[in-house]
From Swiss-Prot:
Residues 1-45 are annotated as: Disordered. It comes from Prochlorococcus marinus subsp. pastoris (strain CCMP1986 / NIES-2087 / MED4). Keywords: Ribonucleoprotein, Ribosomal protein. InterPro entries: Ribosomal_bL34, Ribosomal_bL34_CS. One of its GO terms (molecular function) is structural constituent of ribosome. GO terms for biological process: translation. It holds the Pfam family Ribosomal_L34. It comes from the Bacteria. This is Large ribosomal subunit protein bL34. Signal peptide: none annotated. Residues 10-45 have a biased composition (Basic residues). One of its GO terms (cellular component) is ribosome. Belongs to the bacterial ribosomal protein bL34 family.
Amino acid sequence: MTKRTFGGTSRKRKRVSGFRVRMRSHTGRRVIKSRRKRGRERIAV
């Protein structure tokens, strides 16, 4: 039986698209702002 190779790494996901990373840059802040405006339940990962 072969292993499932795609698991998704939570640490990497946070480092790439977490809230704190988004707040670092101007465009990231824009992402947060637009998601808040749209009423997303999850603003960042």
